[in-house]
Amino acid sequence: MKELQTVLKNHFAIEFADKKLLETAFTHTSYANEHRLLKISHNERLEFLGDAVLQLLISEYLYKKYPKKPEGDLSKLRAMIVREESLAGFARDCQFDQFIKLGKGEEKSGGRNRDTILGDAFEAFLGALLLDKDVAKVKEFIYQVMIPKVEAGEFEMITDYKTHLQELLQVNGDVAIRYQVISETGPAHDKVFDVEVLVEGKSIGQGQGRSKKLAEQEAAKNAVEKGLDSCI
């Protein structure tokens, strides 16, 4: 953790008072499970907190930055900024991938490069930073790491397939769209989800992902790429 502390201090002017909290933010469930006797905490609760503060601060930024954008457009842009792949990219930019504590099995299976794990660690770090400092420090970090890419327009071209599919299907009126998990495979800390999207009870696309959200996006993408004529 000393190397991580050095990175945080040199690049972001961040020094944690509670070093244990920082360590927890970078501890994956697989590592904690392999060291149960040591009663090591993992980062899921901090991820929950970090997700909430991230949503708040990005929402505030977008609201002030784009005073003429409607709510729907703001929601889409926020979703692109805080999606798993985006957060994993920010984690790599900060070198966070080097410091995550993983179980041996997770390490061997390529967990250090997995977007789900990296995105979760990024959110957990934000949660830890909030507890150790305050929301102003979290905002400062986000504005240093994330906002420059937002202002460069890197997220405006990413397709939100769920929203795109909904817009295509509901052009002539409301249509019942539902996403359903077909199967879950793998250990608890590394599940793979298979999801199908149904319109009026009919399956129109399937997708797979390391989280339900990713699998739903893939299912929607599959439906869009098939073409609506084959969907309804």
Curated annotation (Swiss-Prot):
Subcellular location: Cytoplasm
Function as written in the Swiss-Prot or TrEMBL entry: Digests double-stranded RNA. Involved in the processing of primary rRNA transcript to yield the immediate precursors to the large and small rRNAs (23S and 16S). Processes some mRNAs, and tRNAs when they are encoded in the rRNA operon. Processes pre-crRNA and tracrRNA of type II CRISPR loci if present in the organism.
Native organism taxonomy: Bacteria, Bacillati, Bacillota, Bacilli, Lactobacillales
GO molecular function, one term: metal ion binding
Top EC category: hydrolase
Start and end residues of each RNase III domain: 5-134
Protein name from the UniProt record: Ribonuclease 3
GO biological process: mRNA processing; regulation of gene expression; rRNA processing; tRNA processing
InterPro entries for this protein: dsRBD_dom, RNase_III, RNase_III_dom, RNase_III_sf
Active site feature: 51, 123
Cofactor: Mg(2+)
Chief place of localization: cytoplasm
Keyword entries, A-Z: Cytoplasm, Endonuclease, Hydrolase, Magnesium, Metal-binding, mRNA processing, Nuclease, RNA-binding, rRNA processing, rRNA-binding, tRNA processing
Pfam families hit by this protein: dsrm, Ribonucleas_3_3
Quaternary structure and partners: Homodimer.
